[in-house]
């Protein structure tokens, strides 16, 4: 994307930036803050995975192809800020005594399968679910086998299970999100 290339320093600012005074500086500030938030979450055990996404291609209104839609810095920026906004919303609602609808991902019930997958790669994970240990394994595999990392990520995502939504009464702490290493996610 044009924003991603600009953030990476490989392209000039988009012409649209000139229409809003201060927009470039604001996006740079958001990018810096998002990187700090991501680092903080990762230190707490947020999982850093890379699954393959597809982008539909239409010609004359007809779907003609699916193209890989790789991650980029702009997409990561948006995702990081969405996570922060959801966490802030959850904390605000709790602080003000309001109920909320929370998205949570409990610790994997099939942790033994994730342990076995790691063992297949020569890594021993703790006997109990540990997001930080899992993320360290994933990061090592990203470096050791970049070409196979998307497949490994997909396997782990499937073993983690799907997130769920839960109504959380006022004053009750959220159940937490294993993959994001946080309790506040509304």
Language-model features: locations:
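Conserved, carboxylate-rich catalytic/transport cores that coordinate ions
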Residues: 1-186
């Amino acid at each position: 994307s044009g924003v991603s290339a600009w953030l990476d320093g490989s392209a000039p600012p988009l012409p649209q930036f000139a229409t809003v005074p201060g927009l470039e500086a604001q996006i740079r500030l958001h990018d810096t803050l998002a990187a700090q938030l991501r680092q903080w979450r990762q230190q707490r055990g947020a999982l850093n995975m890379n699954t393959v996404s597809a982008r539909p291609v239409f010609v004359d209104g007809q779907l003609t192809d699916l193209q890989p839609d790789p991650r980029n810095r702009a997409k990561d920026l948006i995702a990081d800020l969405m996570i922060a906004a959801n966490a802030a919303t959850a904390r605000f609602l709790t602080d003000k005594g309001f109920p909320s609808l929370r998205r949570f991902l409990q610790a994997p019930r099939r942790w033994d399968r994730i342990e076995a997958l790691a063992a297949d790669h020569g890594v021993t994970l703790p006997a109990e679910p540990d997001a930080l240990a899992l993320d360290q394994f994933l990061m090592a595999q990203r470096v050791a086998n970049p070409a196979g990392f998307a497949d490994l990520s997909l396997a782990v995502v499937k073993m983690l299970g799907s997130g769920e939504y839960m109504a959380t009464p006022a004053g009750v702490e959220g159940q937490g999100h294993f993959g994001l290493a946080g309790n506040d996610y509304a």
